[in-house]
Every structure is written in structure tokens, then in C-alpha cells.
A protein has these predicted regions:
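Membrane-interface alpha helices of multi-pass inner-membrane proteins
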Residues: 162-194
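Specific aromatic-rich, kink-prone transmembrane helix
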Residues: 136-159, 168, 191, 197, ...
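Membrane-embedded glycan-lipid processing machinery
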Residues: 31, 83-87, 125-136, 346-350
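Hydrophobic/aromatic-rich transmembrane helices and adjacent perimembrane loops
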Residues: 136-140, 342-367
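Transmembrane-helix signature of polytopic, membrane-embedded enzymes
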Residues: 103-123, 141-142
Length: 456
């Protein structure tokens, strides 16, 4: 491939990705506020400019950037769910652009790059893509990738003017304004990276570089501020177990093991797609454990390759992604075991977090492919890539087939909103996907009185 065609590829594919995502959003959603929007309506509408709703003790857990965007949406657009959905799609596109810029800089091969983008813009994230309340999470991951990219070019000796300042300022902006709960892994992996890089530098030079300490401090301070704010938040987990972990761990240790393995398997084939395939008799349910084991093995092999070939001395980006992906799996296990379902970690809502590690694995293989001498290992890598392509391709196919049904669900919500009195509590809870019929009615009353969203 010529340099001109390669540059075209690196630019065109990250643009085609969000275009596909926006098309999918149009096909699978409609402008109807339900599910998580019920809580948002009751908490912030209609007086979205009220400072008392902004300056609250747990302000950081509510993600401050949401406030001006929500205020604009309500005041100017009449509370458009579609607006939020588009922001989410554009946020994913921005993240893809950052990853694409890294691939262009490192001259990742065309086949590897196309595989990377295929997985990056896959529909295994459908639950996030069709829930506008989570648009900011896509922006957060774009910011994470950008920070990792800046760190990578500084450490590889290709830093730009102002990069050191960026490394110190970005954590304050990202953690305090954009990241929300995702700041835990973002901050944790940066602290690990700075410690690791400081040790590597010390081994080379025989002295400690104070820059790593300052960078780590600039990560730690906003993280502590977030933790203080988070300590004042009150969370509601409908249907969750409220007791301690130890008794459950002793009584049902297998659930935790299955949860962890399945969360990795979900990155090959999303939960609903897997269940469809099992129900149709395409494959046994036990396949999820094989897929999960294969992904876990890929993590370990990619980590070993980074260390064996000292890839981190040339580029730290893949190693950071691998560490972040693994930490996300651990975090989801520790925070979501309370639902006592071993398949909960396979949910599409976590694919955005888990795919970070998949990107790191693929980039590691792409950058070291010519250096890997083991033919057996190369065969395993190719088989793993085929598995990822097939599983995610099947997920995309099933989701495209399901999209009209998701859109129809939203249209039914809009129809029901016009005459709520005709429906029972059970019908409202089921269709609006929220646990309280009374709160659904309260939220719809707010929208109706202020001529917002479905009542415009």
C-alpha cells in the first residue's frame, strides 16, 4: 500500500465509523425519554439553570459537564433525547480519531488497523449507544485515549511543546468535569504507568526523575477530590444484594469465577447475541467459557509480549490499554457482583470499558508481528483474531436485525405517554423500563407541563 493510500485509510475509516454509528442510532432509537431519563427528569427538570441543583455535595459524581449541556438541551431543543444520542456517537467517533492518530503515527498495518476499527465501532455497545443519558461516557474515553496518547509521545521522545503541562492539567479537567465513576481506572492506570516508567528510567539513569512524581500528584489530587464527593452520594441499585461480600463468596465462590470469565467472553459475543445463538441451537452455552478463557489468555500473552520485547520502551500506549482493560474487568466484578448474576458482566453497557484492553492486545500484536518468531504463537494470534471478528460480526448482524424492534419500543413509549391513565402500573414499569410507576407519571407530568420531549 502506498503512503498516500495509507494516509487516506487512517483518515477515512475513523470517519466512516461514527457515520455508521449515527446511522445505527437513527435506525434503533426515537426521541422518547424513558428508562434512565426518568431519574434525570425528576432530579433536574424543569429548572435546569437552578444553581442549587448544581452545587451539591456529590457534584463530581453527577459529572459537571452534563449540567450546561442538559441546560442547553432543555432550554433550546426542548429536551431532545436524539441530541444526547448524537453526542454519544460523536464522542465514540472522537475516541476513534485519537486511536487512529496513534495508528497513523506508529504505522500500524492496514489489516490490523481495519480489525481494530471494526471492533472499535462494533454494536456490542448498543445499550450505551441507545441510552442518551450516557453520552458523556463516550467523551470521557476519548479524553482517556488522548491523555494516554500524549504520555506515549512524551515518553517516546516525540513530545510537542506544552505536552508536560497537558499531562499535569488533563487529570483535573477529565476527572473533575468529565470522567465520573470511570476516573477510578483512568487514575489508577496512570499512577501505575508513572510508577513503572519512573522505575524503568531509574534503571537506565540511576536517578529518580521528579517529573513522574509531579504527574502522579496531579492525578492523585483530583482523584481524592472525586472520592470525597462520591462519599456524599446516595446510590440506588434496584434488585441488588445489600449485605457483605464474604458470606456470598464463601457460599457461592463459583458465581464470582463465572462472572469474571463471562465478562471476558462478552467481548467476543454480546450477551443477547450469545443467548440467541444458544436458543437457536447454533452452539452450546459453554462456548462463553471458551471465549472468556481465550480472551483472558490473550491478555496474559500480550502482557508477556510487551515485557519480552520491551515494547514499552518504544511505545507505552498498548501496555496502558491492556492494564486499563484488566482493571475494568476487576472493577466491574467488585462493583456488580451485588446483582448475584454470573452473566451480569456480559452486559452491553460494559463493552465500552472492556474494549480498551482488546485494543491494547491488537496493537501489541500489530507492532510486534514482524519480531515474533514463534510460528505457533502467530497461528494462535490469527485464530484469536478470527474468533473476535466472527463473534463481533455476529453481534453486529443480530443488532442490525434487532434495531427496528428497539425503535418500535420507543414509539410505543411515545404513544403511551399521551394517555398514561389507560395503563396499569405493571404496564408502565415494563414499557418505560423504570422501577416505579408513580415516578414515571411524575416525570411525564413534568414534561407535559413544560412542553418538553414527547409533549413538544
Amino acid at each position: 500500500m502506498t503512503d498516500k493510500k495509507r494516509r487516506w485509510m487512517y483518515g477515512a475509516v475513523p470517519l466512516a465509523g461514527p457515520a455508521f454509528i449515527l446511522w445505527y442510532i437513527r435506525a434503533a432509537t426515537c426521541d422518547a425519554a424513558y428508562s434512565d431519563y426518568i431519574r434525570q427528569i425528576l432530579s433536574y427538570l424543569p429548572d435546569v439553570w437552578n444553581p442549587e441543583k448544581f452545587f451539591v455535595p456529590d457534584i463530581l459524581t453527577r459529572i459537571p459537564i452534563n449540567f450546561p449541556v442538559r441546560a442547553f438541551n432543555v432550554s433550546v431543543l426542548g429536551f431532545s433525547v436524539t441530541f444526547d444520542l448524537i453526542l454519544g456517537g460523536l464522542g465514540l467517533g472522537l475516541a476513534g480519531f485519537v486511536v487512529g492518530a496513534y495508528c497513523r503515527k506508529r504505522q500500524v498495518g492496514p489489516v490490523w488497523f481495519l480489525l481494530l476499527m471494526f471492533l472499535f465501532f462494533g454494536l456490542n455497545k448498543w445499550e450505551m449507544l441507545t441510552n442518551g443519558t450516557g453520552w458523556v461516557h463516550f467523551l470521557a474515553f476519548a479524553c482517556f485515549y488522548y491523555h494516554y496518547l500524549v504520555l506515549d509521545r512524551v515518553e517516546s521522545g516525540e513530545g510537542k511543546r506544552g505536552d508536560e503541562l497537558r499531562l499535569r492539567v488533563l487529570p483535573f479537567v477529565i476527572t473533575l468535569c468529565i470522567a465520573g465513576p470511570y476516573c477510578a481506572v483512568y487514575s489508577g492506570v496512570l499512577l501505575l504507568a508513572y510508577g513503572f516508567l519512573a522505575a524503568v528510567n531509574y534503571k537506565k539513569t540511576g536517578r529518580w526523575d521528579g517529573r513522574y512524581g509531579w504527574r502522579a500528584l496531579c492525578v492523585l489530587v483530583p482523584l481524592l477530590l472525586y472520592m470525597v464527593s462520591n462519599s456524599m452520594a446516595v446510590y440506588e441499585h434496584t434488585g441488588a444484594y445489600t449485605g457483605p461480600m464474604l458470606p456470598v463468596l464463601l457460599e457461592r465462590p463459583g458465581m464470582f469465577v463465572k462472572f469474571f470469565i463471562k465478562s471476558f467472553g462478552g467481548m467476543v459475543m454480546e450477551k443477547e447475541t450469545l443467548e440467541f445463538g444458544v436458543n437457536m441451537g447454533y452452539f452450546p452455552y459453554a462456548l462463553v467459557y471458551l471465549m472468556g478463557g481465550a480472551v483472558m489468555a490473550a491478555y496474559l500473552i500480550a502482557l508477556w509480549l510487551n515485557l519480552k520485547y520491551r515494547l514499552y520502551e518504544r511505545t507505552i500506549f498498548p501496555l496502558i490499554l491492556i492494564a486499563a482493560g484488566g482493571m475494568n474487568h476487576v472493577l466491574i466484578l467488585l462493583s456488580r457482583w451485588i446483582f448475584l448474576r454470573d452473566d451480569y458482566g456480559m452486559s452491553a453497557r460494559y463493552a465500552l470499558q472492556f474494549q480498551v484492553g482488546i485494543l491494547g492486545i491488537i496493537l501489541t500484536c500489530a507492532l510486534l508481528w514482524k519480531e515474533i518468531r514463534s510460528r505457533a504463537l502467530k497461528v494462535l494470534v490469527v485464530c484469536w483474531c478470527v474468533m473476535m471478528t466472527a463473534g463481533n460480526g455476529f453481534t453486529d448482524y443480530r443488532e442490525l436485525k434487532t434495531a427496528p424492534g428497539r425503535k418500535a419500543w420507543g414509539k410505543t413509549v411515545k404513544e403511551m405517554a399521551g394517555h398514561l391513565e389507560d395503563y396499569t402500573d405493571e404496564e408502565l414499569v415494563y414499557q418505560f423500563q423504570y422501577g416505579s410507576a408513580d415516578k414515571i407519571r411524575q416525570a411525564m407530568k413534568i414534561l407535559e407541563d413544560n412542553h418538553l420531549n414527547m409533549y413538544r
